[in-house]
Amino acid sequence: GWTLNSAGYLLGPHAIDNHRSFNDKHGLA
């Protein structure tokens, strides 16, 4: 959980899903 996590929460579920996909691609999840 970092800055984008909070930003994604504020932007909405679409942003959260995009952020989760980003983490998965980089193995940060």
From Swiss-Prot:
Coiled coil location: none
Keywords, sorted A to Z: Amidation, Hormone, Neuropeptide, Secreted
Cellular component annotations (GO), alphabetically ordered: extracellular space; secretory granule
KW Secreted (keyword) present: yes
InterPro entries noted in UniProt: Galanin (IPR008174), Galanin_pre (IPR008175)
Main location: secreted
Functional note: Contracts smooth muscle of the gastrointestinal and genitourinary tract, regulates growth hormone release, modulates insulin release, and may be involved in the control of adrenal secretion.
Name of this chain's protein: Galanin
Organism in which the protein naturally occurs: Pelophylax ridibundus
